Amino acid sequence: MKIADSTVLVTGANRGIGKALVKEALRKGAKRVYAGARQPFAHADCRVTPVALDVTNAAQIRAAVERVDALDILINNAGISLMNDLSDRAARERLLAVNLFGTYDVTQAFLPVLARSRSAIVNVLSLASLAAVPFDPLYSISKAAAFSLSQSLHALLAGRGVSVHIVLPGPIDTDMTRNLDIPKASPESTARAILDGVEKEEEEIFPDPMSEAIAEGWRGSALKALQRQFAAYVEQTPVK
C-alpha cells in the first residue's frame, strides 16, 4: 500500500505519534490527510482536513464518516494511559473505551468506505500488548485486548481487500511518557517507520530500537505460529 496519492485518516492527530504521522503522510505524498482529534487544529498544508473525532463519541464518529467520501488508510492512533491501579473501576472503563472500543468503533464505522477498494487499517498499539508493564497494568490490559482485536480483524478482513497492520512500539518521547526516565524513540522516527512498514505490507510493525530488537523472535515464535493456525480457520466473514 503506497502512501503517495492516498487518502489517510489519523485519529489522535493533535500531538505525539499522531501529529508526526500526519506530517509523514504528507511528506510521502498523501493526497488528503484527515486529522482526527477531540480538539481539531488548523494545519498550514491545504491537504490536511481537521476533523472533530473523539473515538468514544458515537455522534462524532458518524459525522466523521459523513465527511470522508473516500479512504485508503485508516490509522487508529488515539490512545490514553492513566497510570491507575486495577481497583479503579472508572479508569478501567475509560481505558477500554478509548484503547479498545474506540479502535473497534472507528474501524467498524469506516469499514464500508475502506472496503470499496484495496485499503489498509493501521492500529497503533504498544509492546505492552505482548507483555504487561507492571506499573501500568490497566494500559497493558487495554492494549492486549486491542492486539487480540487487531489479530482477529486481520484474519476476518483479508478476503475483503483490507489489510490490517499492528504497530508495536516501545517507549516513545510523547506526553504519555514524559515522566519516565528511560530511553525513548522520537515520534518522527516512529511515524516514518510505521508508514514504511505499511508500504512494505508488514503485518506487525516494530518501529523503534526497543521493539525492533524483539521483532525476529516474535515472528518466529510459537504464539505467532498459533495465530497463523487460527487465522487459517477463518473463511471470508463480515465483522460483527
Annotate each language-model stretch with its function.
Residues 14-15:
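Conserved glycine-rich cofactor-binding loop
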Residues 77-83:
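Conserved NAD(P)H cofactor-binding loop of Rossmann-fold oxidoreductase domains
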Residues 84-94:
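Substrate-binding pocket helix/loop in short-chain dehydrogenase/reductase
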Residues 96, 107, 142:
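Active-site helix of classical SDR
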Residues 126:
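Residue(s) in the substrate-gating loop at a strand-loop-helix junction
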Residues 133-137, 180:
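Active-site loop immediately N-terminal to the catalytic Tyr-X3-Lys motif
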Residues 166, 174, 178-217:
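C-terminal helical subdomain
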